[in-house]
Amino acid sequence: MSSLSGKVQTVLGLVEPGTLGRTLTHEHLTMTFDCCYYPPPPSHEAISKEPIIMKNLFWIQKNPYSHKENLQLNQETEAIKEELLDFKAKGGGALVENTTTGLSRDVRTLKWLAEETGVHIIAGAGFYVDATHSSETRAKSVEQLTDVLVNEILCGADGTSIKCGVIGEIGCSWPLTDSERKVLQATAHAQTQLGCPVIIHPGRNQSAPFQIIRVLQEAGGDISKTVMSHIDRTILDKKELLEFAQFGCYLEYDLFGTELFHYQFNPDIDMPNDNKRIKRVRLLVDEGYEDRILMAHDIHTKNRLTKYGGHGYSHILTNIVPKMLLRGITEGALDKILIENPKQWLTFK
């Protein structure tokens, strides 16, 4: 049995699972997203280079990945500290920071934010999508990648003694690449060794989550300790959603606050709004999956911070929870989704 068994590992050390409270399971507090810059059309180049100001906020909201400054969340540490203090004041207790290698992970800043705010912060080990993999990462064997993941949890990440408490978000593209497949296999092997929680970023295709689960299963992963992120932009069909739910992984609706007319990364998808997300969560609760649901905002760009007129990290607690109660989701179910399910997932076996 691991020395981590029965505990949750935050950037400040091990804590008892019962101390977490309401938990957002998929957020970012410091990262860069240059890897996913989406060049604007020539007619929009000028506005894409302007500072973030009131008159261009609507354009940035519709084209968040075409504005380079908007992709530098790591420049907003003080603003994010204030947002975390507000999150705590609104009843929040913990947050899983999903920034991995490839997105400028900075565990030192995460530790500082945890110390300054009193919010439990759990850091993520591992690698983002193939486009961010270095030649060194691509050259590693599954066994070597496993060692990297285990080391980031047992010893520390980014050359520090600050330890990660989950593996992920592990980035997957569609179709899955050879390098991503190796990382998934290594993730399953590390999970077997450590009994740790895992969280996956699936490719933008409804078949991607199914393929990923199969790879993890074949490599010996524990699906019951695994989160499939971004369900709200990936599995839109009700029948397919209920079919996927039978695998037993956690189903994460983590784009609350994102209401896009045009989804730049996949124009074929009509991104659901928060009302539709609430309906999907209600469906899953009614179908008996309330112990498999997680929620978050996946804030990863500046425009989603309250400093820039965005919804911020307190949106779910302030706006979504009351609306869910109006739509017939009980307080008991919400406590499961926001407190009990994250606690169970984040606790090492």
From Swiss-Prot:
A Pfam family hit: PTE
Residues binding a divalent metal cation 1, per UniProt: H26, H28, E169, D298
Primary location: cytoplasm
InterPro entries, per database record: AryldialkylPase_Zn-BS (IPR017947), Metal_Hydrolase (IPR032466), Phosphotriesterase (IPR001559)
Reported cofactor(s): a divalent metal cation
GO terms classed as biological process: catabolic process; epithelial cell differentiation; regulation of appetite; taurine metabolic process
Protein location: Cytoplasm, Cytosol
Enzyme Commission numbers on file: 3.1.-.-
GO MF: N-acetyltaurine hydrolase activity; zinc ion binding
Reactions listed under catalytic activity: N-acetyltaurine + H2O = taurine + acetate; N-propanoyltaurine + H2O = propanoate + taurine; N-acetyl-L-methionine + H2O = L-methionine + acetate; N-acetyl-L-isoleucine + H2O = L-isoleucine + acetate
Binding-site residues, a divalent metal cation 2: E169, H201, H230
Origin: domain of life: Eukaryota
Protein family according to the UniProt entry: Belongs to the metallo-dependent hydrolases superfamily. Phosphotriesterase family.
Descriptive protein name: N-acetyltaurine hydrolase
Species whose genome carries this gene: Bos taurus
